[in-house]
Amino acid sequence: MRRTGTTRRGALTATGATVLGATLAGCGGDDGREDSTIADARAAAAQVENTLRLTAATTSRKLLVRYDQVVKAYPGTAAGLAPLRDAVRAHTTALSQGKGGTLPLSHPPATDAKAAVKELAAAERRTADAHTATLLKAPAELARLLASIAAAGAAHAYLLTEMAKETSS
């Protein structure tokens, strides 16, 4: 004898059909407000990324100025600093997306070459720390770039510390 009334299979089928119908009905009503909301969100995200890029580029540019000052004040350090300086220049270019900028010279380097290289190592550490802090707020692509630059900065700081040990006063 066959059961009469509502079966479990029938109840599940009816529930599934109702949910599917409600879901499909929600997909059709596009009145343009969602498009403007998405566009606003994208514009806000682009603004945040541009601000973070500008901040990071300015930080790297300041470091590049420090390298230039040390090389100018102590020409004997130029050969050792050249590859590191070139890398910092490449980082600055990548962050600024080719839009260059200049910064005024900051305070002069230390009174001797050894101290100047030590100060440069400390500046590299600060810059790497700043990029690391910024990458936490950055979108994925910029975060990867900042992570790479921060890692390079940490390596530069180590190399500069070792260079300072070998530099005569």
What are these regions (language model features)?
Residues R2-T6, G16, L20-S169:
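All-alpha RGS (Regulator of G-protein Signaling) helical domain and cognate RGS-like helical scaffolds
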